[in-house]
């Protein structure tokens, strides 16, 4: 009923799950060539008439011991889809999951763009991941689409969470949310001192060009420096690395 193909590998047909009344299927993609693949095309076979009131939800996992994870669907109006598989290069990478399954982007329909290949936990190409298991469940359209909407909402919530400012303290493995200058100074005291010194030195370098005969600087010159400093910091904070004593 379904088939999948990965670059450099033969076509694999789906197998009906026993006692599922034809509503559940699996496809096992085993690597048969040394070429690594990162895009998987899944489709309904041309000779199959898929009922319009149903959709086929698509799941992935990397081993029989893992739980299936929802990542998309097929239907009569959408008989095929391309999925991009990205395995994290390290278990500590952002977005890594405990079961080793990395990001699978739903419906990369044009198949364009480079994608990371399968990699081991050291970041090098590896054959340690020998198969990828696709699970397909035929469900009533309303039920399946509701499940997909819930999945999308959870993915969006996770993405927003990952976009927050999170810093880790070296050697302690502590992950903290840094929201104030005081918290930053507590977690990274040496780095905070260096940052403060860079800011003061930048101000000194600028203001020293406006000293009067008594060694004073008009306050408006400081205001001008502060406005320029904030604008430059917003555009590219790395300029602070170049601040040195005059």
UniProtKB/Swiss-Prot annotation:
Entry similarity comment: Belongs to the OPI10 family.
Location of this chain's protein in the cell: Cytoplasm; Nucleus
Stored InterPro entries: Hikeshi-like_C (IPR048364), Hikeshi-like_N (IPR008493), OPI10 (IPR031318)
Protein name (record): Protein OPI10
Keyword Nucleus: yes
The keyword Chaperone is assigned to this record: no
GO molecular function: nuclear import signal receptor activity
General remark: Present with 1910 molecules/cell in log phase SD medium.
GO biological process assignments: inositol metabolic process; phospholipid biosynthetic process; protein import into nucleus
Primary subcellular site in the record, as a coarse category: cytoplasm
Designated gene of the protein: OPI10
UniProt KW keywords: Cytoplasm, Lipid biosynthesis, Lipid metabolism, Nucleus, Phospholipid biosynthesis, Phospholipid metabolism
Function statement: Involved in phospholipid biosynthesis.
GO cellular component, one term: cytosol
């Amino acid at each position: 009923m379904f088939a999948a193909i990965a670059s450099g590998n033969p076509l694999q047909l789906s197998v009906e799950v026993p006692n599922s009344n034809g509503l559940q299927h699996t496809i096992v993609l085993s690597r048969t060539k040394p070429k690594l693949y990162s895009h998987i095309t899944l489709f309904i076979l041309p000779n199959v008439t898929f009922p319009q009131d149903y959709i086929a939800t698509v799941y992935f996992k990397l081993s029989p011991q893992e739980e299936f994870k929802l990542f998309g669907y097929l239907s009569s109006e959408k008989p095929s889809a391309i999925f991009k598989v990205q395995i994290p290069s390290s278990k500590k990478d952002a977005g890594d999951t405990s079961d080793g399954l990395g990001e699978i982007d739903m419906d990369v329909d044009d198949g364009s763009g480079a994608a990371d290949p399968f990699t081991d936990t050291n970041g090098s190409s590896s054959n340690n991941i020998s198969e990828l298991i696709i699970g397909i469940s035929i469900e009533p359209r309303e039920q399946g689409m509701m499940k997909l909407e819930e999945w999308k909402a959870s993915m969006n919530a996770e993405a927003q969470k990952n976009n927050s400012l999170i810093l880790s303290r070296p050697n302690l493995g502590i992950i903290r949310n840094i929201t104030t200058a005081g918290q930053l100074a507590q977690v990274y005291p040496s780095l905070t001192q260096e940052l403060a010194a860079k800011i003061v030195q930048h101000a000194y370098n600028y203001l020293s060009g406006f000293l009067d005969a008594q060694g004073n600087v008009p306050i408006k010159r400081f205001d001008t420096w502060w406005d320029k400093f904030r604008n430059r910091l917003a555009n590219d904070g790395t300029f602070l690395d170049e601040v040195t004593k005059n």
